[in-house]
Amino acid sequence: MRKILVIGAGAMGAAFTFPLVDNNHKVTLTEPYNKDFQNKLLKKNKFHPTLKLKLSKRVSIKKFSSELLDEKWDLIVVAVSSIGIEMVRQYLKNIKKKISILVLTKGLKYDQINKKIITMSEQLNKGNQNLNVSVLKGPCLAKELANKIKSYTVIANQNINIAKNIGKLISTKYYKTEYSSDVKGVEFSSAIKNIYSMIIGSGEGENTASALFRKSLDEMEYLIKYFRGKKETVHGLAGVGDLYVSAVGGRNSKMGEYLGKGYTFKIA
C-alpha cells in the first residue's frame, strides 16, 4: 500500500482514483482550482457529475493546502487543467523533500522569459529540483477509465526505471502502462494532437478525414523532431493513439466539425 495524492478533481483526476484504489493504495483527492466543486462532491456522497458515478468510499477528499502537500506522499498525481498548472507549481516549489510527481495534464506554454515553448512538466519543475517529474499520456477517456474499460497509456521519464516503478503502482487488469524515456516527444505529441483532431473533424466525410489523419501524422513527426523529441514517439500511444481517440470521439474533433461547417470559433 502506498500513500498517493491526486491534485485535480475533474473527470480525469477523479477517474484516475479507480485504478489506484484497486491497487489498494491510500488515495486522497483534492481540488485546488474549484473549491465549490469539491464541496459538491462531499455533499453528494462523492457522486461525480461528469463521470456519472460515485467515487470509492476509500477515496478521501480533502481541502487543498500547503499542509496537505507537506504530508509524506509516495506519489503526487497532477491532474489539473493546463490553466491550473502554474497555481500548483507555486505550492510544489516549496516542498523541501524529494518527491515523485506524475503529470496527467496535457498542454504547452510559451515561456515569456526564455522565449520558447515549454511543456507542462517543464513548467512544473521550475524552481524546485526536489521534484522528480514523470508524465502520463495516451488515449484514455475519463469515463471509460472510471468504468474500468481496458485502457493503455504511456509513462515517460528520462530514467525509464522510475517510469516502470510508477507503472507498477497504477497498472491493473484494465489499466495498462507502457514506458518511454522520450519525455519531450510524449508531451509534445499529446499536446499538438488536439490541433490535428480539430483538423480531422473538419473533413467533409470519412475519405477526407482519413487523408487528413495521414497528413496530420506527417506534420506531427516534423514538429516532434523540431522540438527535439523522437519522431517514432508519434506512432505510439501519446501520438497516433491519442490522436485517434480524439478524432473519433473527442471534443476537439467536434469543434473541428463545427468550424468546417462555417461556424466561428466562439459559436462552435
Cite the ranges covered by each PLM segment.
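Conserved active-site and cofactor/substrate-binding residues in soluble primary-metabolism enzymes
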Residues: I7, A11, A15, I83, ...
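Internal alpha-helical scaffold of NAD(P)-dependent oxidoreductase catalytic cores
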Residues: Y91, K126-N132, K150-T233
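Hydrophobic anchor at the start of a short beta-strand
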Residues: I4, H25-V27, I99, L131-V133, ...
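NAD(P)-dependent Rossmann-like dehydrogenase/reductase catalytic/cofactor-binding core
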Residues: K193, I200, K225-A268
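NAD(P)+-binding Rossmann beta1-loop-alpha1 motif at the extreme N-terminus of oxidoreductases
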Residues: M1-L55, V59-K63, S121
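Buried hydrophobic positions in well-ordered alpha/beta secondary-structure cores of metabolic enzymes
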Residues: M12, L41-L42, I76, T105, ...
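Rossmann-like NAD(P)(H) cofactor-binding subdomain of soluble oxidoreductases
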Residues: R58-S66, D70-K148, I166
